[in-house]
Amino acid sequence: MDGKEFLSKIETEMSKCVVGKEDIIKLLLISMLSKGHVLLEGIPGLAKTTIVKNFAKTFGLSFSRIQLTPDTMPSDIIGVYYYSEKTKDFAIKKGPIFTNILLADEINRTPPKTQSAMLEAMQECQATVEGTSIKLPEPFILLATMNPLESEGVYSLPEAQMDRFMFKITLEYPKKDEEIAMLKKKYEGSFETVNSVIPPEELKEAFEKVLEIKISDEILEYIYEIVKMTRTDDRLLYGVSPRTSEQILYASRALAFLNNRNYVIPDDVKEVSKYILVHKIKLKIDYEIEGISNKNIINEILDKAVVFKKTGDN
């Protein structure tokens, strides 16, 4: 199965439960193929949870969901040791993090200590329960939803955690035709149940094909040029880390696969960078007051960055 067919199967299945959102579904698929984590931000009611839950259903993988609240404890996510009366010994009760796809709903409703419980899993694909490190199933993908910081009762995510999210996707209000189509489907009762359409062997094959995507030295230079510009911009308190460069590399290869190419082009890099960079930079307060946003800075950088030599399929 080629990349476009792979994407089409997911989009067709997802159309049973959501109207529009093709760009978001594509980004979720890129993150899946890159084994990256995704943060979806938006006010309540924009179908964040619906999108993530049903996207997970399209794969033949294990899935767990945890609704995060101010009193959620790290052990509620990772698990605990307990004494078993049956075996007369201590055993581990694994938490919901031991799954292929974890939906962390309203991640910024819970305190930083609990949020940080997911850091090890996001980076090392393992979790430590009472000093014992246990590998998570592979792939492990965290899909988290969050409310805007202007909402009541929310916490900022730690910078270390934000850095581990490959994409941050902001959901906007639906367009007129999309909302009307959604209302019509609700009225007619025509939304359908989403099924698994990508079995594990097909997903494994897709992972392998992504790893075969070629990337030239010129494209690597282009990626470095982009991240360097975030580090030297006087309007920023700090730029992005080398982990971000890796995320751009992985996501660009996944996008090339979905476009049925066996090599990365600059447009692949530019397209994924918009969603990878935006949450990993910090504006100085003076520029925030002036109304400049992270998105403004990233768009400016991507417009200025150039590839010094034309790349090709070689």
Segments the model singles out, each with a brief description of its role:
Residues 1, 232-314:
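C-terminal engagement/docking regions of AAA+ P-loop ATPases
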Residues 27-30, 83-103:
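Conserved alpha-helical scaffold flanking the Walker A/P-loop in AAA+ ATPase domains
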Residues 32-69:
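Walker A/P-loop
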